[in-house]
Amino acid sequence: MVINIQPDEIGSIIRKQIKGYVPEMKVVNIGTVLQVGDGIARIHGLDEVMAGELVEFEDGTVGIALNLESDNVGAVLMGDGLTIREGGSVRATGKIAQIPVSDSFLGRVVNALAQPIDGKGQIPASEFRLIESSAPGIISRRSVYEPLQTGLIAIDSMIPIGRGQRELIIGDRQTGKTAVATDTILNQKGQNVICVYVAIGQKASSVAQVVDTFRERGALEYTIVVSETANSPATLQYLAPYTGAALAEYFMYRKQHTLIIYDDLSKQAQAYRQMSLLLKRPPGREAYPGDVFYLHSRLLERAAKLSTQLGEGSMTALPIVETQAGDVSAYIPTNVISITDGQIFLSADLFNAGIRPAINVGISVSRVGSAAQIKAMKQVAGKLKLELAQFAELEAFAQFASDLDKTTQNQLARGQRLRELLKQSQSAPLAVEEQVATIYTGVNGYLDVLDVEQVKRFLVQLREYVATSKPSFGEIIRSTKVFTEQAEALLKEAIKESTELFLLQER
């Protein structure tokens, strides 16, 4: 069979194809690696790269362009960079660092790039958020007015925290800073608060322990853990808090309440110092770079209570900072104190004396939270701080005086019982009605008949007694948020009956 080829037809088909051809040109911004090491790469070329833009190396490692100099670009690596070689090519991606976000992140442990590290498979994501995004402006905010209960009597009564506040937790190592933060997360169960715990430069074993606590206590279902351990590259330790903030913002802008804990910002500052010094940026005080204040301020300003127009979502931040030998006047502590709305100061001396949580009530303050305290708490806790302050003065004086008058002795005895009342075991947060009952008992002298070592046992028994035999007391406090006369009468009855019962048992 002979095929008859028509040259005209073929010619017209070719002409048609040529007409329909769209020439495509892809312009890629390419550079060459000059030098690599210590998590830093110096790159020649990349002329049009932006500050903070992601760059991709031949082996797939991603970096962030931070130093844009006249003849080279300094990039920090998000990985070990062991397979990057001198002379290799680098491509500018045209993107700024962003992470996937969705509700599926709840209950998961992720790294600073929001990739899962808990071995439970990929996390489905619906959208992306920039890791660094600008904080809400003045018009987008409203003042803090709702309480965020931590479950710790000392904090909720005297250093209250409101939703949308930034409250610093500061103290030496091993003074229970993480315990205060994790107890606050445990206390959010059933409160419709999404929690984000960011672990920066911690031991992997410590992070695993915290995750286990959350899982055992049913707190992991409303919590996201972002972790970059001590062996992670400095770049990822520096990014982790911003990733946590981006995850919390996703929920905040969807009209939900969020709580974020940065544990701790001293390690983030150290990672940033390492990066800056390797990039040859000029060092400042304590060898930190000049913009270390901005590093923390732009992070903590993202915590806010949003306006009614934006749905009244909130993001409460509890940054943790470690001090050396109680020195609050070092560079990073003073910076973060000036950015936050108050601080909870944990003292090693109190911790070693068995007063836990080791909160130094004298120098801890909340500059916002008192506006967010419920009325019932304001009614009973007003006298508490004053009595404890007077007790601290008297105690110092009583060390030198031998014969004290009866009034002073009574005041000292009351102070010791109040201090006992503030002690709490770890992972045992108290509901607000239990706190109100506890403080009322102490401030009104109902503990004076007991020995100091009996106080803790009695209070546990009293709280159980109120919950079982006077359930309406808790209902009144929860529903009205006020310590009414009816509630007071119920509580007085419960204290009287419980004290009689307790003293009988002790005999």
From Swiss-Prot:
Bilayer disposition of the protein: Peripheral membrane protein
Annotated InterPro entries: ATP_synth_asu-like_sf, ATP_synth_asu_C, ATP_synth_asu_C_sf, ATP_synth_F1_a_nt-bd_dom, ATP_synth_F1_asu, ATPase_a/bsu_AS, ATPase_F1/V1/A1_a/bsu_N, ATPase_F1/V1/A1_a/bsu_N_sf
Positions marked as site (Required for activity): S364
Pfam families the UniProt entry points to: ATP-synt_ab, ATP-synt_ab_C, ATP-synt_ab_N
Classification via SUPFAM superfamilies: C-terminal domain of alpha and beta subunits of F1 ATP synthase, N-terminal domain of alpha and beta subunits of F1 ATP synthase, P-loop containing nucleoside triphosphate hydrolases
Residues annotated to bind ATP: I170, G171, D172, R173, Q174, T175, G176, K177
First-tier enzyme category under EC: translocase
Record keywords: ATP synthesis, ATP-binding, CF(1), Chloroplast, Hydrogen ion transport, Ion transport, Membrane, Nucleotide-binding, Plastid, Thylakoid, Translocase, Transport
Example of a GO MF term: proton-transporting ATP synthase activity, rotational mechanism
The UniProt record lists the keyword ATP-binding: yes
Reaction(s) the record says it catalyses: ATP + H2O + 4 H(+)(in) = ADP + phosphate + 5 H(+)(out)
Location of the protein in the cell: Plastid, Chloroplast thylakoid membrane
Chief place of localization: plastid
Enzyme Commission no: 7.1.2.2
GO cellular component: chloroplast thylakoid membrane; proton-transporting ATP synthase complex
Family: Belongs to the ATPase alpha/beta chains family.
Role summary: Produces ATP from ADP in the presence of a proton gradient across the membrane. The alpha chain is a regulatory subunit.
Subunit structure: F-type ATPases have 2 components, CF(1) - the catalytic core - and CF(0) - the membrane proton channel. CF(1) has five subunits: alpha(3), beta(3), gamma(1), delta(1), epsilon(1). CF(0) has four main subunits: a, b, b' and c.
Name of the protein in its database record: ATP synthase subunit alpha, chloroplastic
